[in-house]
């Protein structure tokens, strides 16, 4: 936990009163602990260094991005994943090297593709066969692409954040031949060069079982089809702790288990291990952040519920309404033990605009 109470009973982060931050910047405000973010990044670096494999870490900017965050990512020697023109623009405005930027997304627009080409990004992560044609059409020089494959593996997480199952909207199915079709299609283009293979099976993954299973499927497919690549990106989705009972992904142990499985599988297949890439986002910033709200009205329905309404809602905090995510709520201005259970509600005109149930 990155927050604690000081002697005055005020909640603090990094020694700074969150009450003071709320008064200075207003609410809702999202506040991050920079030291915690850097520490998480360095844990990933050390875990991969211990594996002995060639690796790269890309920050998934959809987790949280702004110019200062991009600069921090640059300082910590990470690459950057973007999924929109806006995220790419932010990265470029921060002075981030475009060659270290990768463009994701299952439905990139022509404008986004052209913008990325104009700024000579590192590579595109291709999600559909049609996208191969689009990139090749607008390119006027060689472009690296990484194919996102669908391994047909269900991660043990909420159905809304599973992305590797057979009926997912993401990726090129290995089982149904789309992945191999994409490899051959890239080879037949004028400008595209196949740099690597990518997979991502979901979010809030606490263990390594599904990730290892997927890595083995992909390596077996690569070896059986004699596809040589310089990058194997195993995605992200590493889980974090939101409330008591949640388990954070064990970075050191988890990376060790995954990389050892990759080594053993590749050796058995006599397949050369390419550079291994990962894309943590939430697991870098999620436990380092807190959202500040100001309490407004309080509605007590005797024997039914007590609603404490705040000055934000599902417009800035969608996860509770979207798939029942759970959160912990703390008072900023006093350290008192809870003596009742309430529902923290947003201010939007939706009955589902709830931030925390049973706070």
Language-model-detected regions and their locations in the chain:
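Active-site loop/helix belt of alpha/beta enzymes
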Residues: 152-297
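A charged N-terminal "starter" segment
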Residues: 1-124, 129-144, 180, 184-193, ...
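A cross-family glycoside hydrolase active-site/sugar-binding cleft signature
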Residues: 58-60, 81-83, 102-104, 125-127, ...
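Charged (often Lys/Glu-rich) extended helix/loop segments that serve as interaction or gating elements
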Residues: 271-359
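Short clusters of hydrophobic/aromatic residues that line enzyme substrate/ligand-binding pockets
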Residues: 3-5, 11, 170, 344, ...
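Active-site-proximal loop/turn and secondary-structure-junction residues that shape catalytic pockets
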Residues: 63-65, 86-87, 107-109, 128-130, ...
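Solvent-exposed alpha-helices and their adjacent loops that cap or buttress functional pockets
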Residues: 93-96, 117-118, 137-141, 162-164, ...
């Amino acid at each position: 936990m990155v927050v604690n109470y000081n002697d005055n009973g005020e909640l603090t982060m990094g020694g700074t009163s969150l009450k003071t931050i709320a008064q200075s910047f207003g609410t809702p405000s999202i506040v991050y602990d920079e030291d915690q973010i850097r520490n998480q990044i360095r844990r990933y670096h050390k875990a991969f260094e211990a594996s002995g494999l060639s690796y790269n870490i890309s920050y998934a900017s959809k987790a949280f991005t702004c110019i200062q965050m991009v600069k921090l990512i640059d300082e910590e020697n990470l690459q950057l994943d973007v999924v929109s023109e806006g995220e790419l623009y932010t990265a470029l405005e921060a002075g981030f090297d475009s060659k270290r930027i990768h463009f994701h997304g299952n439905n990139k627009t022509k404008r986004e593709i052209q913008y990325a080409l104009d700024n000579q990004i590192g590579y595109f992560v291709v999600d559909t066969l049609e996208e191969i044609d689009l990139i090749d059409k607008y390119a006027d020089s060689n472009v690296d692409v990484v194919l996102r494959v669908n391994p047909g593996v269900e991660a043990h997480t909420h159905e809304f954040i599973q992305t590797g199952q057979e009926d997912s909207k993401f990726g090129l199915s290995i089982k149904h031949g789309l992945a191999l079709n994409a490899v051959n299609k890239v080879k037949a283009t004028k400008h595209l060069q196949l740099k690597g293979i990518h997979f991502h099976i979901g979010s809030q993954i606490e263990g390594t079982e599904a990730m290892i299973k997927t890595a083995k499927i992909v390596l077996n497919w690569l070896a059986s089809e004699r596809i040589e690549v310089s990058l194997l990106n195993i995605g992200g989705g590493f889980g974090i702790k939101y409330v008591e009972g949640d388990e954070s992904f064990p970075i050191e142990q988890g990376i060790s288990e995954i990389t050892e499985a990759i080594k053993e599988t590749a050796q058995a297949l006599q397949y050369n291990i390419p550079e291994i890439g990962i894309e943590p986002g939430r697991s870098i910033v999620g436990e380092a952040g807190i959202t500040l709200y100001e309490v407004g009205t309080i509605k007590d329905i005797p024997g039914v519920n007590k609603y404490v309404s705040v000055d934000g809602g599902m417009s800035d905090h969608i996860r509770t309404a979207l798939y029942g995510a759970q959160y912990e709520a703390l008072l900023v201005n006093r350290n008192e033990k809870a003596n009742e259970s309430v529902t923290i509600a947003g201010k939007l005109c939706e009955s589902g605009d709830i931030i925390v149930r049973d706070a």
